[in-house]
A protein has these predicted regions:
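Bacterial N-terminal signal peptides that target proteins for export
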Residues: 1-10
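Bacterial N-terminal signal peptides
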Residues: 9-18
Length: 264
């Protein structure tokens, strides 16, 4: 069965909404005439001071009960530590996926297997119950989104999570033992063989301390290639590896596609 299209970027939805709104504003603002509305709808328009453009904009986002949105947005929850799923065009919030932070209302992090998942993401022996989620990314097949998994990174604590989209549930959190923070998102290679996590700020490797006077000698960046086992739906830490980089500040890091396949 063909999966419904999934969209990761909030900006895409916002841009589309902006274009629709701009088109509506340019139309002549008449009340209850051009859209062929029933008398009851016309009465509502008059009572509420709505224009045809207002009603048209509302209809563009309306999805009746029992019908599905055409697209989904997977938005980072920032310092909530979780992911938010919204439908497009309705913009309804369909789901909050608990990832790095406990969510008692959905039973995440308050007992059972979810406690073990959160414990997996401990850093330096400390159990973490907060995060700063940035740039979630969908799994890919031949460089195209396949909607099977989504990966999220914790910018504040250098961790990556695996979410299975069969049930929209977090299955694994891995902690990066090399770096203090990341900002490379959790981008994947074209067939999701690896999830790429890069450090944001240069720091001594191994999450240790060194004075700035030793910056050139001890401060470094890192790109980690987490090996993903698609059959198990888990990152295989034993088959993962890292590349040491110079001590510069890094931002997003994705894998190449088509002519740039094999580069990152």
């Amino acid at each position: 069965m063909r999966r419904r299209t999934m969209v990761v970027s909030v900006l895409l939805a916002v841009s589309a909404a902006g274009l629709s709104y701009a088109g509506c504003v340019n139309k002549q603002e008449q009340k209850g005439v051009d859209i062929g509305a029933s008398q009851s709808v016309k009465d509502l328009m008059v009572a509420r001071g709505l224009t045809d453009a207002d009603v048209e904009a509302a209809l563009k986002t309306y999805v009746p009960p029992g019908k599905h949105d055409e697209y989904m947005i997977f938005a980072s929850g920032g310092q909530s530590g979780n992911l938010h799923v919204m439908g497009v065009p309705s913009m309804r919030q369909l789901k909050t996926i608990a990832v790095f932070s406990p969510e008692s209302w959905q039973g995440y992090g308050v007992g059972g297997d979810s406690d073990k998942i959160l414990a997996e993401g401990s850093q330096d022996g400390h159990k973490l119950t907060w995060a700063d989620v940035h740039h979630p990314n969908l799994s890919e097949t031949n460089g195209d989104y396949d909607g099977e998994f989504i990966f999220a990174n914790d910018k504040a604590n250098a961790r990556v999570a695996v979410v299975d989209l069969k049930d929209f549930a977090t299955k694994q959190i891995v902690a990066n033992p090399l770096v203090a923070s990341d900002h490379g998102g959790a981008f994947v290679t074209p067939n999701t063989d690896y999830v790429i996590e890069t450090s944001q700020y240069p720091a001594p490797l191994g999450r240790t301390y060194a004075p700035l006077s030793e910056f050139k000698e001890k401060y470094r960046g890192v790109a980690v290639f987490w090996k993903f086992d698609r059959k198990r739906g888990r990152i295989d830490k034993a088959k993962s590896w890292a590349m040491e980089l110079p001590p510069y500040t890094q931002d997003l890091a994705d894998a190449g596609k088509l002519d740039s396949d094999g580069w990152t």
